[in-house]
Amino acid sequence: MNINLDTAKDTLCKNILIYGYCKYENKGCAFSHNRQQPAQQQQATNTSNNSTSVITPNSANSTASSADLSSKKKFNLNTPSFQPSVSNLSNKFSTLSPKLKEIPVFKPENGVSEPDTVDSPTTQRPFTSKRFNVSTPSFTPTNFDFANNSNADGNRGGASTPIGISSAPLVQNQQQQQQQQQQQQKQPLAVPSPLASGAQPPTMQHRILSMGVSQSSPSTNPYFANNLDMSAPTPGSETPGPVLPGSAGAAAAAANQPMYPLQYHLYAPAPPPRLTIPLQPYETNSQAMFIPNDLREYLHKKNEASLQSLSHSNLPEHVNQYHSLVPIDKSYEPVSKLWLGKNSLIFKCLDNIDGNLYVMRKIEPCNEIINEKPFKTIKRWKSIKNANIVGLQDAFTTMAFNGNQSGNTSLCIIYDYYPNSISLLEHHKKGLRVEPVNEALLWNYLIQLINAIMAIHEKGLSASSTIDLSKIIVTNKNRIKLSSVGISDILEFKDDETNQDIKIRQLQDIQKVGKVLMELAILLLPVNMRQSNNIYNSLKASTNLSEEIINNLQELNDLDTASGEFDLNEFSQRLTPKMFNIIDSLQNSSDFIEGQLTSELENARLFRLMTKLNYLIHDNSNSENDKIIKLFLNYVYNCYDSNNKKVINLNKVLINLNKLDCGIDEKILLVNNDECIIISYKELKEIIDTKFRLMRE
């Protein structure tokens, strides 16, 4: 671009107009960087020349030359703005076009009343040179009270506004603005005072900034599933568990509760599909060498739940042989809906004998239990080993929870622990993210529940209150288990119970299975149709459920438990065609898990080798063997390519470590700054084993 250097020095740089500064100001930019516009400088010069009594020819010539320069400019800021004439318009919208003089002009108001005439040149600043107007009213939320600020600053400005800014109208006509601009142009450019041009006093600005900082809403966390407000964890701190409402440790646990969950994505994540590089059949990437990210995160969450602890609680330190109690009931509703008049809570605990984790369900008060007769069925419950039943381990009564103050006895039942398991009620109805119900899922649940019922009935027992949406837990994808088994046998114990009573209760179990599945099936209906008298016709007409599943649900729900007969074995045979789908999915899942275990099989071997190498390189002995080991580690981890760029290749590390662990005869070249060594993996392995053996001795 050709630039006329004579005229460029009088032209304001466009970077000043656009950005407010020019980074090439002291680096050769030929344009003017004076914030006072050249037109205003020329007008100020003319005004000062007119005020003198003698006009010299030189001043006249300079004025003429300045006029010529201004006429040659591409843009003239003093050109009057275009004003359309609306008097000659004849269309019907001509009355809607406003006149230029009627357009309201924004004028910033100052909280301090100023005189009409400007006396001090230090209190004025040209309007065009201001970048920000501090006196512009800022946005004020309606849910905050600024009464104190407005009262404290009422003497400085308008008391009716929250920040002390005058509430006078901001509309001025065009003539007043032109007069004000002329007065500004007559004044020389000066450094503005803190209170000039509507600027806030320092104390006022401090209050506004402090309000803006203190009123910022707390950020929510994307990665936390329950959207709880938590604080950032500190390294080495315990992960607190859930706290019972009203417990002594509630405040302390809330103060130490982490703001963010564990960062499971700290591992190298898989790239998004759009960035995945297509691979050849003989190629692979590092993601295929290790466990998938979703499975790893799923298992990490289970481990986190297992290691969760609770400090500063009012729970007993030991209950029989169990300790380290942590509440895991998410509902925090101690009043039981199944066992009337009882309070029920669930805890995670550690067994002091075998060190395993278990679940303790505490039910109180249970003062009616005065001997061991109600526990006579516990041995049969412990003998049941079924994939769809949570194993019962122990049952006893204790007074450890009340400290012998109230005298109430608590019933404690110990079950196997499945971390992060939720009930069907939370999974499909009342959870944050409910799982939709379909026909395949109903068949899956029906087969698993029938499998559990058959195992219970073979022992001469009944599930009773266990078959409920709140007592059936989901331990894995589409895997359910009956929990809280054996409680009804203890709380509803009868000495004179006959075989006919047991048979009636077993028929009630089958009917409850139908009711549970019906509660899930009606979730497919609209809300206004879920209370219909003929619910089966509504399911056939308004859902995609097959007639076969609806007929099975109707058969289970219409069972006569008083005098009816039901052959559970014959009913299970009718479910055989649907069982093949479940068997197929279970076998596929088993193959997948076995494949993942196979990929992780050699991790322990390589870890032992790396641990051995680290022991050797940090040994204080100086020998030739130490030099060889360090050269090998440099060969593996400190390689550079032809562009002098460090090579970071996981595949290379795994290949070299595996070759070293196997001790093959392949030779490698180990290079140092002064020398090089040719050695085989077999010789290197013998050196490492010998040195490690000597170090141990």
UniProtKB/Swiss-Prot annotation:
UniProt keywords, alphabetically: ATP-binding, Coiled coil, Cytoplasm, Metal-binding, mRNA processing, Nucleotide-binding, Zinc, Zinc-finger
Coiled-coil zones: 577-615
Annotated segments matching region Disordered: 40-67, 106-240
Binding-site residues for ATP, renumbered to this chain: 361, 416-423, 470-471
GO terms under cellular component: P-body; PAN complex
GO terms (BP aspect): mRNA processing; nuclear-transcribed mRNA poly(A) tail shortening
Full protein name: PAN2-PAN3 deadenylation complex subunit PAN3
Family that this chain belongs to: Belongs to the protein kinase superfamily. PAN3 family.
Quaternary structure and interacting proteins, as annotated: Homodimer. Forms a heterotrimer with a catalytic subunit PAN2 to form the poly(A)-nuclease (PAN) deadenylation complex. Interacts (via PAM-2 motif) with poly(A)-binding protein PAB1 (via PABC domain), conferring substrate specificity of the enzyme complex.
Main subcellular localisation: cytoplasm
SMART domains, sorted: S_TKc (SM00220)
Organism ancestry: Eukaryota, Fungi, Dikarya, Ascomycota, Saccharomycotina
Motif (PABPC-interacting motif-2 (PAM-2)): 69-89, 106-126
Record's function text: Regulatory subunit of the poly(A)-nuclease (PAN) deadenylation complex, one of two cytoplasmic mRNA deadenylases involved in mRNA turnover. PAN specifically shortens poly(A) tails of RNA and the activity is stimulated by poly(A)-binding protein PAB1. PAN deadenylation is followed by rapid degradation of the shortened mRNA tails by the CCR4-NOT complex. Deadenylated mRNAs are then degraded by two alternative mechanisms, namely exosome-mediated 3'-5' exonucleolytic degradation, or deadenylation-dependent mRNA decaping and subsequent 5'-3' exonucleolytic degradation by XRN1.
Bias-annotated ranges (Polar residues): 119-153, 212-224
Molecular function GO terms recorded: ATP binding; poly(A) binding; protein kinase activity; zinc ion binding
Residue ranges, annotated region (Knob domain): 616-697
Domain notes: The N-terminal zinc finger binds to poly(A) RNA. Contains a pseudokinase domain. The protein kinase domain is predicted to be catalytically inactive because some of the residues important for catalytic activity are substituted and it lacks the equivalent of the binding site for a peptide substrate. However, it has retained an ATP-binding site and ATP-binding is required for mRNA degradation, stimulating the activity of the PAN2 nuclease in vitro.
Source taxon at top rank: Eukaryota
Compositional bias ranges of the Low complexity kind: 172-187
HAMAP family, A to Z: PAN3
UniProt cross-references to InterPro entries, sorted A to Z: Kinase-like_dom_sf, PAN3, Pan3_PK, Prot_kinase_dom, Znf_CCCH
Region (Pseudokinase domain): 308-576
Protein localization: Cytoplasm
C3H1-type Zn finger ranges: 7-36
